[in-house]
Amino acid sequence: TPKMILASACLPYLYQAPEIDGEYYWDGGYMGNPPIFPVIYNTDCQDVLIVQINPINIHEVPRSANAIFDRINTLSFNSSLMREMRAIHFVTSLIEKGELDPAKYKHTFIHTIDAEEQMSKLTASSKMNLDMEFLKYLFETGREKAGEFLANHYDDIGRKSSTDLAAKFF
């Protein structure tokens, strides 16, 4: 429904939480961005592709109020993803060592498409930028990064993770 779509992108510092069936909702990124475990356990597919819109690494210490707000936004939206990636890495390593039964625990291959360099230059306010040129820039950046992923990792799909979870998320 339109209300569900609004709720899925509701940033609480900008909008009131939409009410759906007596419950109030905010952007799901505050709890799971994206929630990975339902994707893993509700399919037979071993591969999960994560398209990251928030950078993981920001190399500058925030000094201004706006920069601190941007860092809080990045941390809050990445924290659940990082936690899940660490859990997946842990389970995968136990499966590979033979300490967990692969018939009971799923060996998952993680792939990521990201634009760290481009996204780390954007502030939290860019999430509200509806300028067509900006949206075209995001679209073209995504298309370019998806093409790079396919060129470099297509053969990994169904065989192995193309993302080094320890290097990227620890």
Predicted regions and their residues:
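Active-site glycine-rich loop that binds ribose-phosphate moieties when present
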Residues: 2, 6-14, 28-35
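Short acidic-hydrophobic surface loop/beta-edge motif
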Residues: 14-20
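Non-catalytic peripheral regions of patatin-like phospholipases
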Residues: 23-25, 29-170
